[in-house]
């Protein structure tokens, strides 16, 4: 039968002590340094939702390398914590505060034309900060914020070559974007090469990359 949990139930000392020991162990693990930042890493909310940042560059570079993709995209809204991580040690807590959602990496294949639409979506709210703004790796693009949304992207290059609307590109994404989240319906309709159940965790991938760079 169901037992209601109310304030009338006395605290069990043995359970309390067990939970406290576990909490202390977890706190020590979270505060364990896993690497070092040679420069401050910018995870401030306004910045990651309106412009390229070095934290966004690092995360998307790791995503692209991990899945061997042509490029990687991460919505700025996936980065939380709203802070500038100072130069110095990076802990597990730091990385989990920046990426708290438990996202899994997905590899999809999309045409260049769909990527163009995605980039238009990314800058549609600019200069207003928006969670849909994309941090990117493997591509560069310019846009004109004075033009109407949907017509702002001027040119795009993927690994130094102009974006080909007809070509298929492989893209590393968090599962949220792969499901069409934040208005990215073109990814929800994309061909999936590595689905979420088989993809690596985003924060685990980042932890591994930071630890490898330390060694």
Where are these regions (language model features)?
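Catalytic centers of hydrolytic enzymes
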Residues: 1-215
């Amino acid at each position: 039968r169901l037992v209601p949990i109310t304030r009338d139930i006395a605290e069990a000392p043995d359970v309390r002590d067990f939970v406290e020991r576990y909490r202390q162990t977890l706190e020590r693990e979270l505060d364990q340094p896993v690497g070092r930042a040679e420069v401050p890493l910018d995870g401030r909310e306004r910045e990651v939702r309106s412009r390229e940042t070095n934290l966004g560059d690092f995360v998307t570079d790791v995503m692209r390398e991990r899945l061997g993709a042509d490029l990687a995209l991460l919505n700025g809204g996936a980065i939380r914590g709203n802070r500038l991580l100072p130069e110095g040690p990076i802990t597990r807590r730091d990385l989990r505060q920046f990426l708290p959602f438990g996202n899994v990496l997905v590899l999809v294949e999309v045409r260049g034309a769909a990527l163009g639409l995605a980039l238009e979506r990314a800058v549609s709210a600019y200069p207003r900060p928006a969670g849909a703004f994309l941090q990117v790796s493997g591509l560069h693009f310019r846009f004109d914020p004075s033009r109407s949304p949907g017509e702002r992207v001027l040119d795009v290059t993927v690994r130094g070559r102009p974006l080909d609307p007809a070509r298929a590109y492989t893209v590393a994404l968090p599962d949220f974007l792969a499901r069409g989240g934040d208005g990215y319906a073109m990814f929800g309709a994309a061909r999936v090469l590595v689905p979420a159940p088989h993809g690596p965790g985003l924060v685990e991938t980042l932890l591994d990359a930071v630890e490898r760079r330390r060694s």
